[in-house]
């Protein structure tokens, strides 16, 4: 029903799309993609982005570090990561911002500002969506409450399904694509999944309320109030996009800071550098140009729980990856595989694909008959080390709470949304 409701939004073009990991969400389904024609009454809807604005994934690749070499040191590495990575609800981050002026630099500069302040290297920005910074951000469109929530959380993982996971490449499907990505069987990687924390949540809350009140002024009626929306070109639409871009920059800076904390751990414990393969959001609305009915049109592409998947030779790709397409990073669960895919030509869903396994049990259902300690012990028997802040949080994220990620990936591959490159298996997981 949510996919059908999205299809009624003013200005929608082509279709309302559901990715293979689709499940129920706020307004839009999670795993939903829709684009609206910016110049023909197209709207923007915060429900099409979600509360965790710019939630996304980045993958770090261990330079010359093999799974067998890491294995004896893995417990020590996980203990160090446990201490180095702030996480949990309301947790303070690794970067203590001195004032709101510095926060505003983060909101407009994203990962680029973090790198300029010494938290990373220039190559990191080449491997980030939009070079690590989304243009059009305006902190003036953000409430004091949202700014206050963001001030103390930069450089923290959060809770829920957010994680930092040490992984190893288990299988390579496309050696030609895997080579420039630095992926070979046994290669150690680190996947980071988090977003814009309380700041992004508050921005969504604020602008949904504003749009609910504003829709009448634009003559808009929607079948579900959670689909509150306004024209992209309206003052309300522009205000949301400016605030959303600021949250996107916060999310990118957040992952950049966690990257540096992880690099320090690996440098100290293994002497191995970690190179960034790619960083991409899966909760975002972006103004893009796509062919619509034979003409190039400016459209607002909503991707909620959906990963951008650019094809080979797209102008936004870094030169080293242009021939193979954008790396698409799709995590599984604590006990299952994650995947690296690559974008393909001909993707009908505005170059979008799945973003994860897709939840099938609510957090309450998942935790009802399972203890976090039992899950931790079960995973330990399989050689997977879990470090969490709460037993309930681990129980809520048990592998059985999600769809079979292998099936989600196969559906993405077979339907022409992306192609499989490599399969990664978990070695250790830091959970919020």
Swiss-Prot record:
Does NAD count among this protein's keywords? no
Q: InterPro entries from the xrefs?
A: RtcB, RtcB-like_sf
Q: Where is the signal peptide?
A: none
Enzyme class of the recorded protein, top EC level:
ligase
Q: Name one GO biological process term.
A: tRNA splicing, via endonucleolytic cleavage and ligation
Pfam families linked to this entry: RtcB
Catalytic residues (UniProt): 355 (gmp-histidine intermediate)
* GO cellular-component term (any): extracellular region
| Origin: domain of life | Bacteria
Quote the subunit structure annotation: Monomer.
User: What does the miscellaneous comment read?
Assistant: Ligation proceeds through 3 nucleotidyl transfer steps, with 2',3'-cyclic phosphate termini being hydrolyzed to 3'-P termini in a step that precedes 3'-P activation with GMP. In the first nucleotidyl transfer step, RtcB reacts with GTP to form a covalent RtcB-histidine-GMP intermediate with release of PPi; in the second step, the GMP moiety is transferred to the RNA 3'-P; in the third step, the 5'-OH from the opposite RNA strand attacks the activated 3'-P to form a 3',5'-phosphodiester bond and release GMP.
Record's protein name: RNA-splicing ligase RtcB
């Amino acid at each position: 029903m949510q996919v059908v409701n999205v299809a009624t939004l003013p200005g929608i073009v082509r279709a309302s799309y559901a990715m293979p990991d689709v499940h129920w969400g706020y307004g839009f389904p999670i795993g939903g993609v829709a684009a609206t024609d910016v110049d023909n009454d197209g709207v923007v809807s915060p429900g099409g982005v979600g509360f965790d604005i710019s939630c996304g994934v980045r993958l770090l690749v261990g330079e010359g570090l093999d799974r067998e070499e890491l294995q004896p040191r893995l417990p020590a590495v996980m203990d160090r990561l446990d201490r180095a990575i702030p996480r949990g609800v309301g947790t303070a981050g690794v970067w203590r911002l001195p004032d709101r002026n510095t926060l505003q630099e983060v909101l407009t500069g994203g990962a680029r500002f973090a790198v300029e302040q010494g938290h990373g290297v220039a190559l990191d920005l080449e491997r980030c969506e939009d070079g690590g910074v989304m243009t059009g951000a305006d902190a003036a469109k953000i409430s004091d409450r949202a700014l206050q929530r963001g001030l103390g959380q930069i450089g923290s993982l959060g809770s829920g399904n957010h994680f930092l996971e040490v992984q190893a490449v288990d299988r390579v499907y496309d050696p030609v694509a895997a080579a420039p990505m630095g992926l070979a069987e046994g290669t150690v990687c680190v996947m980071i999944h988090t977003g814009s924390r309380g700041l992004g949540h508050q921005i969504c809350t604020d602008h949904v309320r504003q749009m609910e009140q504003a829709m009448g002024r634009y003559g808009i009626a929607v079948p579900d109030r959670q689909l509150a929306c306004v024209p992209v070109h309206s003052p309300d639409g522009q205000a949301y996009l400016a605030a959303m871009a600021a949250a996107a920059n916060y999310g990118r800076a957040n992952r950049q800071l966690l990257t540096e904390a992880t690099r320090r751990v690996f440098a100290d414990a293994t002497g191995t550098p970690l190179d960034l393969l790619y960083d991409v959001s899966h909760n975002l609305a972006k103004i893009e140009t796509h062919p619509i009915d034979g003409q190039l049109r400016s459209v607002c592409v909503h991707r909620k729980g959906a990963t951008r998947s650019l094809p080979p030779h797209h102008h936004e790709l870094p030169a080293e990856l242009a021939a193979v397409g954008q790396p698409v990073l799709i995590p599984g669960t604590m006990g299952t595989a994650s995947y690296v895919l690559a974008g393909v030509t001909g993707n009908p869903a505005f170059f979008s694909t799945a973003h994860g396994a897709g939840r099938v049990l609510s957090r309450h259902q998942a935790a009802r008959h399972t203890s976090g300690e039992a899950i931790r012990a079960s995973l330990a028997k399989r050689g997977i080390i879990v470090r969490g802040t709460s037993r309930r949080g681990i129980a809520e994220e048990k592998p059985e709470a999600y769809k079979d990620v292998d099936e989600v990936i196969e559906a993405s591959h077979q339907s022409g949304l992306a192609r499989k490159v490599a399969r990664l298996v978990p070695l250790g997981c830091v959970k919020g």
